[in-house]
Amino acid sequence: MAVILDGKQVAHFLRQSLAEQVQTLAKEGKPIPHLAIVLVGDDPASHTYVYNKVKACQEVGFQTTFIQEASHVQESTLLYLIHKLNEDTSIHGIIIQLPLPKHINAIKIIQAITPSKDVDGLHTFNYGRMACNLPTHIPATPLGILLLLEHYQIETAGKHCVIIGRGPTVGAPLSILMSRNAYPGNATVTLCHSYTQQLTNFTRQADILVVAVGKPGLITADMIKPSTTVIDVGITRIPDTTKKRGYRLKGDVAFEEVATLCNAITPVPGGVGPMTIAALLTNTLRAATNQVYNTPTS
């Protein structure tokens, strides 16, 4: 049976450390990290994600400002809101819960955030610094994955890391991070996507397999080798009348069968999700203490 990479437990340890750092800041009379979260519309999944982020902030002692706009909000209104949040010196981090309604240009909205407050790490300024291996905000989910690999001391140097999914929030940035000259990193990376032919030929070569496509049960036991470390980023709501909430969460990996063969695996839920939030909090603390671009306060 595979080693379970318990993101929920590791995230708990990270939040404890963050809470201690916040207490130290308070004792020294320094600003407490303050995160602004903007939600547009009434998507149930987005509401759940935002609730979990606000709850985590409260647990570690961060201040939060939650702003919800109607799904028909004008793009110009959203841009003005971000402008005001940028100008507010008491706010250290800003996140826009994705996805946004189709009439709003998500890229334009993200680019409007001041890079030092872009704690989701999606601004092109931060993305470019990440690509150059310079200090910056790293996108939350890839950072969470790196922290998880580091906690479990998963060897990455010289390993073949196969990433399925080339999205801008997970697959694309993680491909850069896993090939950088650092730990975790120094891996040989293969990035697969919807046009990749004979996917199994690649997954069977993977020492580290990261799946982030949102297709439940895509990866089965016959697609991996026994020594593989599997990171399942996918999370899909499957209708289930036996559950009180009416659905269950399923990842991109057929967990039960793959876990009997692989070396290590993240569960869904309880794997990458909690680590993403822990990484977001980490970025926010760094923003509050001016450590984003390697300029810590004295």
Curated annotation (Swiss-Prot):
GO biological process, one term: purine nucleotide biosynthetic process
This protein's UniProt keywords: Amino-acid biosynthesis, Histidine biosynthesis, Hydrolase, Methionine biosynthesis, Multifunctional enzyme, NADP, One-carbon metabolism, Oxidoreductase, Purine biosynthesis
Superkingdom in the source lineage: Bacteria
Reaction(s) this enzyme catalyzes, per UniProt: (6R)-5,10-methylene-5,6,7,8-tetrahydrofolate + NADP(+) = (6R)-5,10-methenyltetrahydrofolate + NADPH; (6R)-5,10-methenyltetrahydrofolate + H2O = (6R)-10-formyltetrahydrofolate + H(+)
GO CC aspect terms: cytosol
Molecular function (Gene Ontology), one example: methylenetetrahydrofolate dehydrogenase (NADP+) activity
Pathway(s) served: One-carbon metabolism; tetrahydrofolate interconversion
Keyword Transit peptide recorded: no
InterPro entries linked to this entry: Aminoacid_DH-like_N_sf, NAD(P)-bd_dom_sf, THF_DH/CycHdrlase, THF_DH/CycHdrlase_cat_dom, THF_DH/CycHdrlase_CS, THF_DH/CycHdrlase_NAD-bd_dom
Keyword Oxidoreductase: yes
Residues noted as binding NADP(+) in the record, renumbered to the chain: G165, R166, G167, S194, I235
Enzyme Commission no: 1.5.1.5, 3.5.4.9
Entries under PROSITE patterns matching the protein: THF_DHG_CYH_2 (PS00767)
Pfam families per record: THF_DHG_CYH, THF_DHG_CYH_C
Family: Belongs to the tetrahydrofolate dehydrogenase/cyclohydrolase family.
UniProt-listed PANTHER family: C-1-TETRAHYDROFOLATE SYNTHASE, CYTOPLASMIC, C-1-TETRAHYDROFOLATE SYNTHASE, CYTOPLASMIC-RELATED
Quaternary organization: Homodimer.
Function in brief: Catalyzes the oxidation of 5,10-methylenetetrahydrofolate to 5,10-methenyltetrahydrofolate and then the hydrolysis of 5,10-methenyltetrahydrofolate to 10-formyltetrahydrofolate.
Name listed for the protein in its UniProt record: Bifunctional protein FolD
Organism: Amoebophilus asiaticus (strain 5a2)
